[in-house]
């Protein structure tokens, strides 16, 4: 880690001045590999050990056939192959399928998933049968991907970027990424308060001990020991989303064959002086005896009999005891293997629960980072795949039951194989999950949501693409909560979750991003984990098997949710120190977390909590004692003494040092120039706007088949940038333009953040962009083919002989796009262009297929030119956003004495309230960099109050012959006279955002209306009405424009004519009754009559909004009569 960090640059340099600029690197950069690390590593973990663990823990499927045979089925192993062309497809150059093939063919990048099903009849094992369950999507650059171990050079050869880090799925041609979600820390007993728990039953309180128990196959369940107001406790477990509650001492008696006295001694051990707790333990033991169950066997039979109906997994020929064993094994503390370990953990949970209930220790917060971990894509994929395989086995059983209906029907290998084929597969379900992000789960998989789990990996620009891989979401459930607790950034998130990079609005504080050096732990070497208990005993830990009296001043010791023993308070720090030594020097797992919580009055429950499992957030710091890098976790960081700066270290107190001051920020926050000189919201805005910038999303343009891509034609490298910009090689995907900016209120067009662009700069390509759109044309019928109509000579100038447009030709709305021969009706058909904007044909590709009956498929990529227009949005890297309000002729703009004319005129009123000092520094630094032909470092925290940035860059300007303060005298472009003010003048890196007026403008005269309200429909594409909201209404009211208000909201909206009765004030009672047809065939009617009054003289016509009429009608349906008060005019 340290050597890799030493290889990183410390100051930025001009990229194209380096000799290695054009060379493909030998290996992927550490920073770039870290982006996809958690995704790829978790998927690889699933492929190597995860699927084997899933098969090992799958519940066998037992049933009794009509012939009396006891049939049992269990999956023995699951494996996933690399993507390959099917064997029955011939004439292929290579059998391997690569991601770029899937993208261009608009198919999924998938490999075959296979299982081995073991089965037995009456206990006699039969030969296992292998079966393919369909193709499942493969993660890019994982071990199942054909580019898994490819070098950057090989990646380029196969149409990928040399800096591709993987972590995505290609689903039907689109790139998808599984969201990382924040979950409760696994296998850690947490004391929690939840008001909803009071509604779980009589006497239930809001206090409980929660354990999110996760097994090695990533199966996840919640177990809770609830504190009851009568001084007892109940144990909660769930099965298929259904909760069950059992007295906790009944569970203890089922787990171990101990007497009541022994259970009592275990529960009160160390707390004999706590009279309240002792009396509660006695009450809980009496509660079990009140059910008339006394022995271990009686308790097991009692529980088994009670829950048998809920657990059909246990065959009917097995006794009630086996039902209890199934519950204890599969639903109670599933991360522990032995009943003894489960017993000890529940005992500890009871002890901690009653201590917290008495207020001796603090209740913990699951919204705090120390009690959280991350749901990784590989783990979610593994859980869902396992559940689908279990469902498939159940379907095999159902097929067998349909076939074996007679008493003489026996199960044979042929029958079993036939039923396995008929049972379907898992490929479609997994692909559907990754395409939609929705999970259809029977058990819930331990998740709080079943939608929004997968998002599109939008490649608007490099920053947007990068941010997806470090994004970490709290969960969609919390977006609907009114409380802000889940959104708060707590101090223990320091170094793990970026405080800057979170969106504003609904997802604020819920959608966060991991910091630059934060890593997610993976499964460690099992040998190193097994060595930990022995190390602890050697260091002085008293194991639980040691039955001697334990005093109160002892720390509990936990390893991955397993209670190992106790250590003396006096030896705790020495043991923690030795554990750190083992972690740093490799005798113990490198990602081991040593969560030591010392004794503190009214503090957190003390103990030594060691975690080695996967999915934890870890980060590197410098260990001052051992002079090495050490990885620390969220729980252990709270009680460590870490200095940010070497100057802040205290001798014999500070134990660790931060590796760099900028490591607490995310990748995108580290790209902001000098964020320490900005007001904090501006840095948040830049993180969002950086992701909306038009730039260079990719380099493999000829092989791109994305639906929509934005491209800035002439991007430039920033002259003032943080060193992280170079470390992640952002110059390869440049975004933004270096503009000469004059800060002056020169015209009336630059008010309210608007900016003026030099028309001459615009004409020379300033911020010129394009949109690339790809259309897929498919002919399903075999007899159809692309061809130009031979008898339509007017098509010659538009289409080639193959019926497709010429590359480079210009297309407009209504012009022929392609022509094909329809074999079914034996005619040529011309399809016309439906895009409203003019565009140019960039490329045309004929696409193949891996199907046995290939379809004729063509991909046409169109380029839509988008030069900067009035109304387009721009922003600097300091969060100063604004729209282009005018393209001003260069002759009318002010100029310097050297003849320099600004590209952008920025209004000075944008600085004071926003306090973006970094943009002022950038103006000076960019000017200095342009003068000296250099790049200046914008990494934060490099300057101080003694060595100020403004002084440094001011002297640089002086050295170049310019004013120290960055100002210049300008001459008016109107009359040529010198302006009497000093104008701030320099170079700023400006970003062109993707919000363009061409995509937003909307106009409507008449058109479609909603059937229900008769108001204009919404939607720009559907020709809907212009949006007129509350703010527009308020503006017209305050302006006194009453007629305009009536015009917009009434005459041009939903005006309707209706009858009203002056007497009763009803609009529903008047009736225009049709009587009969007259001689001419028309309808004649009586005068309008009010059905309530029976009078026809007081009925007249009025104009009202139709939406109001609809409201009156709806109110009448619930017996509310709306009456009008009418006045004669």
Swiss-Prot record:
A zinc finger (C4-type) spans 1061-1093. It is an enzyme of class 2 (transferase). Disruption phenotype: RNAi-mediated knockdown results in decreased cell size likely as a result of its role in the synthesis of ribosomal RNA precursors. It is found in: Nucleus, Nucleolus. It catalyses: RNA(n) + a ribonucleoside 5'-triphosphate = RNA(n+1) + diphosphate. Keywords: DNA-directed RNA polymerase, Metal-binding, Nucleotidyltransferase, Nucleus, Transcription, Transferase, Zinc, Zinc-finger. GO terms for molecular function: DNA binding; DNA-directed RNA polymerase activity; ribonucleoside binding; zinc ion binding. One of its GO terms (cellular component) is RNA polymerase I complex. Belongs to the RNA polymerase beta chain family. Component of the RNA polymerase I (Pol I) complex consisting of at least 13 subunits. This is DNA-directed RNA polymerase I subunit RPA2. It comes from Drosophila melanogaster.
